[in-house]
């Protein structure tokens, strides 16, 4: 997964008296961008465990980006909800807006620049993304948005192999992503709370069902806010 750029530090955020970040910089803009790990991670898994080559795996996505795909109702809603943020970044607006407005449901959306990037990855592997033209474009855009990423950050990115988090639910073993990903551990926590109730006989969609689910999630998210983090730096009571 992504990592913080080497130049990231607590002082880059504006915080209030409680230590909470005042602006939305932690969600949008250059400061919120980590050094991307997906490309290197996916290629590692493909090489170690796969039996297809890069072209066979990536070509369908290239075709989709070049030929386009139909905008769904959910995507249309997301475009409308994020209009203000999309408009801040011309390159993003060029892709996800049509004449300055969200694409309509059913419109064809193409992303040829993404296709070109994936074609480079097919040809040259991870180096095509973490060095050279693509890396330079990533850093340029990030720095322009007040981010901290450098070419060195990209070139030096290393994947980390972690043991999965393991839990149980009604006799089933569950294996899921380890921290700093928070979803896995807290999904197990939520399930462990819910297994104290006879969920099988509580109608899905009923008030009782949603009440138990929301209360379980509330407790999990409270623990997430208090304890979750990166195990390279803190100890987490898993």
What residue ranges belong to the model's regions?
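Noncatalytic scaffold domains of N-terminal-nucleophile
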Residues: 1-131, 135-178, 182
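A structural signal for alpha-helix termini and helix-coil/disorder junctions
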Residues: 48, 67, 120, 144, ...
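Internal maturation/activation junctions in enzymes
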Residues: 197-238
């Amino acid at each position: 997964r992504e990592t913080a750029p080497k130049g990231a530090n607590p002082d880059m955020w504006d915080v209030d008296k409680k230590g909470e970040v005042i602006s939305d910089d932690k969600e949008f803009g250059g400061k919120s961008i980590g050094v991307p790990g997906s490309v290197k991670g996916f290629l590692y898994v493909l090489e170690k465990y796969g039996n297809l080559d890069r072209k066979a795996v990536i070509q369908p996505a290239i075709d989709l980006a070049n030929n386009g795909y139909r905008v769904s109702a959910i995507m249309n809603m997301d475009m409308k909800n994020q209009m203000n943020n999309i408009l801040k970044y011309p390159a993003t607006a060029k892709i996800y807006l049509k004449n300055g407005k969200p694409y309509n449901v059913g419109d064809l959306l193409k992303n040829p620049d993404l296709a070109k990037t994936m074609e480079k990855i097919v040809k040259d592997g991870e180096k095509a993304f973490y060095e050279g033209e693509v890396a330079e474009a990533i850093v340029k855009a990030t720095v322009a948005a007040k981010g901290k990423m450098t070419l060195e950050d990209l070139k030096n990115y290393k994947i980390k192999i972690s043991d999965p988090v393991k839990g149980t639910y009604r006799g089933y073993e569950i294996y899921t992503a380890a921290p700093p990903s928070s979803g896995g551990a807290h999904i197990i926590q939520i399930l462990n709370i819910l297994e104290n109730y006879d969920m099988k006989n509580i109608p899905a969609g009923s008030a009782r069902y949603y009440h138990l689910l929301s209360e379980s999630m509330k407790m999990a998210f409270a623990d997430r806010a208090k304890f979750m983090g990166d195990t390279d730096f803190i100890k987490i009571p898993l």
